[in-house]
Design a protein with these regions (language model features):
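Positively charged, low-complexity intrinsically disordered leader regions
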Residues: 1-43
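Short, glycine-rich nucleotide/cofactor-binding loops
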Residues: 20-24, 50-62
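Structural motif
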Residues: 43, 119-120
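Histidine-anchored nucleotide/phosphate-binding helix
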Residues: 57-75
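Conserved mixed alpha/beta catalytic, RNA-binding, or beta-rich assembly cores of soluble enzyme
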Residues: 60-61, 120-221
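Short internal beta-strands
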Residues: 76-83
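A glycine-rich helix N-cap at a beta->alpha junction
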Residues: 94-119
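C-terminal functional extensions of proteins
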Residues: 173-279
Length: 279
């Protein structure tokens, strides 16, 4: 039997993800792709960047760039919203980037909306506030001092601007959609910020890749880059300053997983992508 996109992006699941996965749509990547293609052509905000031990972690930026480049090819105008730890990551691919200050307020975000008038918003591995209004890592340690409040956009414009969240641990923007399930199973205070569609993956990058594979099938066009390109991009971010979110080391690994595992996931998604294009 052919593996689904969701089965691929949930390989090697840990941290209670198989449990909370029950509360997410079986075909969440397809639904995300369908939602994106329903948006009017224009600006799409993409946000990522998760602070870990003085750096941004390697999970998030790669998936965001892959998704942003796919959106460009489909006629959208991706704009990256992030903060200082991701400085220089997105300029590598000439993507328009806004660095949101740590003390940003509602006026900051109102001006962003008025300036760009986004047709949709996507978050990939971006920490969101918990019920105590804190941004916390998987160990429950506050990283609020190092996290711009970009999730305010998803709160203030819920129901106004369509949104998609991609996460893998429970503390990311979008997880508010299943916060109750996370609270019951995982030993952390979940993010309470919801999105219209939630994609849960073992690694958030994989969730973003899964959305791109689903987009490919719907438009009949290969949008997913080859593994060597993805590895090269992650390597460049590590050289700039990015760490593995599990080991906290400046290595070309993601959430403790090697590039061999990354290649395995990309290869599996490429098979599905090719099948969708040929269908």
């Amino acid at each position: 039997m052919t593996e689904t996109i969701e089965e691929v992006i949930l390989r090697y699941s840990q941290r209670g993800i198989p449990y909370i996965r029950r509360y997410v749509s079986d075909n969440c990547c397809e639904k995300a792709a369908q939602e994106i293609l329903s948006w009017e052509k224009g600006v799409v905000f993409l946000t990522t960047g998760f602070y870990v031990a003085g750096y941004a972690e390697t999970d998030g930026p790669a998936g965001t760039v892959v998704l942003a480049l796919a959106l460009q090819r489909l006629g959208y105008q991706p704009v990256i919203l992030t903060d200082q730890p991701c400085q220089g990551f997105f300029e590598l691919e000439m993507l328009p980037t806004v660095y949101v200050p740590y003390d940003a307020d509602q006026e900051t975000f109102r001006e962003l909306i008025e300036t760009y008038q986004p047709k949709g918003m996507i978050s990939v591995e971006r920490c969101g506030r918990n019920r105590f209004l804190q941004y916390a890592n998987m160990r429950g340690v506050s990283i609020s001092e190092h996290t711009a409040p970009i999730d305010e956009l998803f709160v203030a414009y819920q129901g106004v601007i369509p949104s998609i969240g991609v996460g893998d641990g429970g503390n990311e923007i979008g997880m508010g959609k299943i916060a109750g399930a996370i609270s019951r199973k995982l030993s952390l205070e979940p993010c309470v910020v919801s999105t219209d569609i939630l994609v849960v993956a073992t690694v958030s990058n994989w969730g973003a890749y899964g959305i791109v594979a689903a987009l490919s099938g719907r438009v009949g066009q290969k949008l997913l880059p080859v593994f060597s390109w993805i590895k090269s991009y992650i390597t460049k971010t590590v050289e700039i300053g990015s760490v593995d979110g599990v080991t906290h080391e400046l290595t070309c690994t993601v959430d403790g997983k090697s590039m061999l595992t990354e290649q395995e996931i990309i290869t599996a998604l490429e098979r599905i992508e090719q099948g969708g294009i040929c269908a």
